A protein has these predicted regions:
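Short acidic-hydrophobic catalytic motif
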Residues: 8, 37-183, 188-277
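C-terminal catalytic/acceptor-binding lobe
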Residues: 58, 265-297, 327, 479-664
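Short beta-strand-to-loop acidic/aromatic patch adjacent to the donor-nucleotide binding site
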Residues: 396-408
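Conserved catalytic core of nucleotide-sugar-dependent glycosyltransferases
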Residues: 410-488
């Protein structure tokens, strides 16, 4: 049926003829009635769809209006029946109901599965694997996993190679540092008892183990305990023969969880305790810092240093993924007189959470560095990135102190650098100032106020001049593909360019780290454990100017001239080679044909039980130390310029390596 549009005649003042003419002018091709053609099917569907949308919109608006009106009515009714304070009670009641619902949603127990075997160790909680180590030739020993007793979250994961010396002591220390109440899971991979001594076994027994005293060579073992409480389960498999391993053991236990409020300490609020709470609620193994009753302080108030020359010198701490080392190091550094936390930055090689959390625990600045390279090259690149970042963070700093995470700092660490820093300004022949003496052992050093000059770069806590790094070292630093040790590179003649480092007779740092890329417990025992370490808080370095270039030559010549030449017919390995007299100066001459001839020196170093892996700590082919209470100078002949003072009747001592024999 056609649609019709009827046009009305608007006559107004116009006559009939004008009206018709006007209509013709407006619609020259239309009659009084306009007939439209029928709409096509697509247009009809479009109109229908639009109409439906309008209807839906109207219905939605209506529903919302009804909801608003209903809500308003109920609010009015509640306000009519409420009294002051009722609303707070309602909110608190609702909060309690929500808390109860959350607690009901948390599991009341954990299903823990533990595997101990020759090739693999694993732990799963409620079907989720949280520890798995099946890598060849790695992960040997006892794996220890610490879980939160309220949530089941992982708080610590450590591996102790108890096949190696002293790892049982490290494990015992760690277990003693874990707070009571925590869930602890143990599992052996490969072998875990060869070096596990009785004290460690006794500790495991006190924790609940019934097998600790009998676990033997290549036996498999797993245990789950609640520290200070129940032992939930233990599984053991004995090795039948020396060349075989015990059968794999699988331990399955159900561990009940405790309420959250029973797993946290009620420390009073402070900024210090806020950091403590953040740390201790999800990380374990740090002992008294997380004690509920007597927590160790996190804020230190060391003495100030009179005329402190390093108060504004940035301190770069070179760290990796050894958080317990970092924790120990930071406590000693922040306790040292003159420490300024605002100038300390911890640089972490990799995106490891726990070292960063340790840094934040002490309120310090921490920067995670993206690893570049592998092994030695990675360490070298980490040092470079850290040094560059240090001088970028502190653009006005002329110096920087660099110290590693596995070092204790002496009480006068900053005082030592404050007193000696001016040497870098006044003597261009000085390369660095180090807190470490490579040859400073308990039996070879004794004067905390004495300084030496050495051609080697010791590291292990040292003061670097900005101009040296920016103008020379940074651009020439070994690239990532070069597997070089950064400190060995800095000792190269073409890099050092005849300059020397200043070191103390008694070191101001102590190397305690027994694990690392180039470190193990045996190496630590032999070469670092008996190093001397200053513990005096106030030491005034004497005759600082004596180590300036020209003054030092006069000093050494004076010592040689007044010294007593030892009996060169005796072996340096003989106990009576050095007389038991204190306060003297003893002189010893050894064979050294050229600057790289260290054959005899390394054998002498073995006899003296000091660093003997490579030549270190010498000045113009002369080594200086204390032995039996007297100063000792060892001079290489004919290479050293001091060899001219050798009496004609004295033949320099010559020693060759003894194959298969190590004198330590």
């Amino acid at each position: 049926m056609p649609l019709c549009l009827t046009m009305d005649s608007h006559r107004g003042a116009m006559g009939p003829q004008q009206s018709r003419a006007s209509r013709r002018s407006l619609f020259p091709y239309a009659s009084h009635t306009l007939v439209m053609r029928p709409m096509t099917r697509p247009r009809i569907l479009t109109k229908v769809f639009q109409s439906l949308l309008v209807i839906v919109l109207l219905v939605t608006i209506g529903i919302n209006i009804m909801f608003i009106m209903d809500t308003s009515r109920r609010l009015q009714e509640e306000s009519q029946h409420s009294v002051p304070g009722d609303n707070d009670d309602h909110v608190h009641a609702e909060s309690r109901r929500n808390t109860l619902r959350l607690q009901e949603s948390v599991p009341k127990s954990l299903a823990i599965d533990v595997l101990s075997s020759q090739m693999k160790v694993s732990v799963s909680v409620d079907g989720t694997t949280i520890l798995e180590d099946g890598e060849d030739h790695k992960g040997r020993g006892i794996h220890v996993l610490v879980l939160n007793q309220a949530s089941g979250s992982v708080m610590a994961l450590r591996t102790f190679d108890t096949y190696s010396p002293h790892e049982d002591e490290a494990m015992a220390l760690f277990l003693n540092m874990v707070s009571d109440g925590r869930i602890i899971v143990f599992a052996i991979k490969d072998e875990g008892t060869f070096q596990m001594k009785q004290p460690a076994r006794d500790l495991l027994k006190r924790l609940g183990s019934k097998r600790a005293q009998v676990i033997g060579w290549r036996d498999m073992w797993a245990m789950v305990i609640h520290k200070g409480g129940k032992m939930f389960g233990e599984s053991y498999s004995k090795s039948s023969e020396f060349n075989t391993w015990g059968a794999p053991v699988i331990l399955r236990v159900e561990v009940p969880l405790v309420p959250f409020e029973d797993s946290e300490c009620d420390w009073p609020y402070s900024e210090e305790n806020r950091r403590r709470r953040d740390f201790c609620n999800h990380i374990e193994g740090y002992g008294s810092v997380c004690s509920c009753t007597d927590p160790a302080p996190l804020i230190f108030n060391p003495e100030t240093i009179l005329n402190n020359q390093v108060n504004d010198v940035p301190v770069a701490i070179i760290a990796s993924n050894r958080p317990h080392y970092l924790y120990r190091m930071l406590r000693s550094l922040l306790s040292a007189n003159g420490a300024n936390p605002d100038m300390i930055t911890v640089f972490i090689d990799g995106y490891f959470e726990e070292p960063l959390e340790v840094t934040k625990l002490f309120g310090l600045r921490g920067i995670q560095h993206t690893p570049i390279g592998a092994k030695n090259a990675r360490i070298s690149q980490h040092y470079k990135a850290s040094l560059t970042a240090t001088f970028n963070i502190f653009p006005n700093a002329k110096y920087a102190i660099i110290v590693e995470e596995d070092l204790d700092a002496s009480p006068d660490f900053f005082s030592y650098f404050s007193q000696t820093k001016r040497l870098l300004e006044e003597d261009e022949s000085i390369y660095c100032i180090s807190a470490w003496n490579d040859q400073g052992y308990e039996h070879t050093s004794e004067d905390s106020s004495l300084l030496y000059r050495v051609e080697t770069m010791p590291g292990l806590g040292w003061l670097l001049k900005r101009s040296l790094y920016k103008d020379e070292l940074e651009a020439k630093w070994p690239t990532p593909e070069k597997m070089w040790d950064w400190d060995m590179w800095m000792r190269l003649p073409e890099v050092r360019r005849g300059r020397e480092c200043i070191i103390p007779d008694v070191s101001r740092t102590y190397h305690f780290g027994a694990s690392g890329l180039n470190m193990n417990s045996y190496f630590q025992d032999v070469y670092f454990k008996k190093h001397s370490f200053n513990t005096q808080p106030h030491v005034e370095m004497r005759n600082i100017d004596d180590v300036k270039k020209n003054n030092y030559e006069e000093l050494i010549v004076g010592l040689i001239k007044k010294g007593t030449v030892l009996d060169h017919t005796k072996s340096p390995c003989d106990e009576n080679f050095i007389p038991d007299r204190k306060g003297d100066v003893f002189i010893m001459y050894i064979k050294m044909d050229d600057p790289k001839d260290f054959v005899t020196w390394l054998q002498v170093a073995k006899c003296f039980k000091i660093w003997d892996l490579d030549p270190r700590g010498y000045h113009k082919s002369m080594w200086r130390m204390h032995m039996k209470g007297s100063e000792m100078l060892v001079i290489g002949v004919p290479n050293s310029e001091y060899s001219k003072y050798k009496p004609m009747s004295v033949a320099p001592i010559s020693m060759e390596p003894i194959k298969g024999k190590v004198r330590r």
